[in-house]
């Protein structure tokens, strides 16, 4: 059944390493590339990943902070007095595991609950090797499919943007490995959206952090899957408003806002996590997004189509295909954008939820 297929797919991807997991997380938000069923299956990669060994994590902490041994991480780990340990306590199992690291719950000597993110051993080397393998294999696949299409007299092979997805993910992964950069990104993101009043970021503890170990305050809250329908709708609304403000007002965007990187805190604020992937938005793109939102609210689909083209959602000149299995072709007609606007209007009117607040267009 679908659940079994999804579990099998996720297990296979997790076994291929962090680059595969990150590509899977990215594709979980692209039903246009992999289909709805695959997207649903891949979503579990956002919050459920295979952890690496606790011994390796403790060893990384000991090395990063130049401790005598892993026993000096916390009293409950090695039985040493608290005065000889980095933390007052440190969980024996990870609270969460991600593609490049895992998080432990700890307590500082001044009694603060904190989250300690420890990078996977040899993460940089693994990412570099995985990406190289991906790039080489994908090039071979592209050439083989192009050759097969040429033999059949068909048009050029359309890679469906998968190659671009892999390149983008790999670039971002190298940034994610720099925890110093992530801490700076988090502070900048908090400051950029402070005016909203309902967005927060975990406070960074520099004295307990390094380039490969990141310590922040422990967030008391829940991810979307653990929330009630009412609270889930609230978090979704707050997250959408925050992301929209980033796109059209601040120009500083969290580039990986999937379910695993969002929490609703007990005080009702939405908390963003994981700031390894960030992006800056040019002013003209911000203006085009704003125009697109205004056009959508006014149901002005001609202006919305132009905004799509301005931000790059549509190519110039237009390209189209009848179905996902066909290659894109140039839509070489003088009224191509008007026809697209007409089809967009029809789709929004006939698709279930098409004109609702979080409907088909979202």
Residue positions per predicted region:
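Broad phosphate/nucleotide-binding scaffolds in NTP-utilizing and phosphate-metabolizing enzymes
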Residues: 1-246, 251, 259, 263-283, ...
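Histidine-centered phosphotransfer motif of kinases
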Residues: 254
């Amino acid at each position: 059944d679908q659940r079994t297929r999804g579990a099998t797919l996720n297990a296979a991807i997790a076994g291929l390493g962090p680059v595969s997991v990150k590509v899977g997380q990215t594709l979980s938000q692209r039903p246009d590339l992999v289909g709805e069923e695959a997207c649903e299956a891949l979503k579990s990669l956002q919050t459920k990943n295979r952890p690496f060994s606790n011994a390796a994590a403790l060893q990384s902490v000991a090395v990063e902070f130049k401790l005598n041994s892993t026993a000096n991480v916390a009293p409950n780990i090695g039985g040493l007095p608290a005065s000889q340990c980095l933390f007052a306590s440190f969980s024996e199992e990870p609270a969460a595991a991600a593609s490049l690291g895992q998080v432990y719950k700890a307590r500082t000597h001044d009694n603060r609950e904190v989250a300690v993110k420890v990078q996977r051993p040899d993460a940089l080397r693994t990412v570099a090797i995985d990406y190289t393998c991906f790039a080489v294999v994908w090039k071979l696949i592209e050439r083989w499919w192009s050759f097969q299409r040429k033999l059949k007299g068909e048009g050029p092979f359309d890679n469906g943007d998968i190659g671009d997805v892999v390149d983008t993910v790999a670039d971002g992964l190298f940034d994610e490995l720099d925890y110093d950069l992530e801490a700076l990104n988090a502070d900048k993101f908090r400051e950029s959206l402070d005016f909203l009043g309902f967005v927060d970021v975990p406070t960074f503890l520099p004295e307990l952090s390094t380039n490969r170990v990141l310590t922040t305050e422990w967030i008391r809250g829940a991810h979307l899957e653990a929330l009630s329908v009412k609270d889930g709708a609230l978090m979704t609304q707050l997250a959408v408003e925050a992301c929209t403000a980033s796109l059209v007002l601040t120009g500083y965007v969290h580039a990986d806002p999937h379910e695993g990187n969002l929490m609703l805190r007990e005080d009702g604020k939405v908390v963003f996590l994981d700031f390894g992937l960030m992006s800056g938005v040019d002013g003209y793109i911000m203006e085009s997004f704003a125009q697109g939102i205004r056009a959508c609210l006014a149901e002005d689909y001609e202006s919305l189509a132009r905004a799509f083209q301005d931000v790059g959602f549509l190519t110039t000149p237009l390209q189209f295909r009848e179905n996902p299995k066909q290659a894109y072709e140039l839509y070489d007609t003088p009224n191509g954008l008007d026809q697209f606007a007409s089809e967009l209007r029809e789709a929004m009117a006939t698709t279930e939820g098409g004109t609702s607040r979080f409907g088909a267009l979202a």
